[in-house]
A protein has these predicted regions:
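Walker A/P-loop NTP-binding motif of AAA+ ATPase domains
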Residues: 58-266
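AAA+ P-loop ATPase mechanoenzymes
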Residues: 1-79
Length: 267
């Protein structure tokens, strides 16, 4: 399906950009455009722009054309996302006590957590920023805590500039916020920065349309201070027999199948 494939195509593109960045580090060609004869101010500006481009290449900002109807099964998760994000955003006057800004999607891999987040952004006609935790922690793309700060700053700018909802989806959340037996200074600072940013959007009285949706296959590995910041936790379960049958029907309806093929048997 072309609509769903767009998500994975963009993710492959982000990984290719990351590989290019790593190869540039190994070859010593990290700053190819800096003119050694330029003034220190010009060199710093060039380097800052280069780092900004590296950072933005790792992030998917274009919203995929994915609707709720494209997400088969997981009805409980869809209803929970509607109640947690969609309804409060559209009718905030009905939620005077506030609503969660941090949502954790957890469950087995390959069950549609990314697609659910993208469909939520489409339902709200908002922005969808997709980044994986391992990219944020990459030592080759600058200091991790600065990446976290830049990520939230960019998301807030989108929300404030056009007053549109922004879904900040962080995949592989455990690689960024998981429990550590030994931590180096950069990891500690990045995790503290993430805590600060989450507290900023979760504060009472905040009228922000920025939502952080984290996804993980290992929720037990997350540190408790971070887990508390995700006020809503939604389990994305394995598809049932009925859901698997609908999936086969959806993805084979454009194929020419042998008359003996039955979706129920495949499911």
């Amino acid at each position: 399906d072309s609509q769903l494939n767009k998500i994975y195509t963009e993710r492959v593109k982000s990984y290719r950009n990351r590989i290019n960045a790593l190869q540039a580090v190994q070859s010593g060609d990290v700053e190819p455009t800096i003119d050694p004869t330029a003034s220190p101010e010009e060199q710093r500006a060039t380097l800052a722009n280069h780092q900004k481009n590296n950072f933005e290449n790792m992030i998917m900002k274009e919203r995929p054309d994915v609707r709720w109807t494209d997400v088969i099964g997981v009805d409980d998760a869809k209803n929970a996302l509607r109640e947690s994000i969609v309804y409060p955003t559209k009718r905030s006057d009905l939620f005077p006590l506030g609503w969660p800004r941090g949502i954790l999607l957890y469950g087995p891999p390959g069950c549609g957590k990314t697609v659910l987040a993208a469909a939520t952004a489409n339902e709200l006609d908002g922005y969808f920023i997709n980044v994986d935790g391992s990219t944020m922690m990459s030592k080759w793309l600058g200091e991790a805590e600065k990446n976290v700060a830049k990520l939230f700053k960019m998301a807030r700018s989108y929300a404030d500039r056009e007053s549109k909802p922004v879904i900040l989806f962080i995949d592989e959340l455990d690689s960024l916020l998981g429990e550590r037996t030994n931590e180096i200074g950069g990891e500690v600072r990045s995790r503290n920065q993430f805590l600060t940013e989450l507290d900023g959007i979760n504060g009472k009285g905040k009228d922000t349309k920025l939502y952080v949706i984290g996804a993980t296959n290992k929720p037990w590995s997350l540190d408790h201070p971070f887990l508390r910041r995700f006020q809503k936790r939604i389990y994305v379960s394995l598809p049932t027999l009925e859901s698997r049958e609908k999936l086969f029907t959806l993805y084979t309806n454009k194929l020419k199948l042998d008359g003996r093929v039955r979706s129920h048997t495949l499911a």
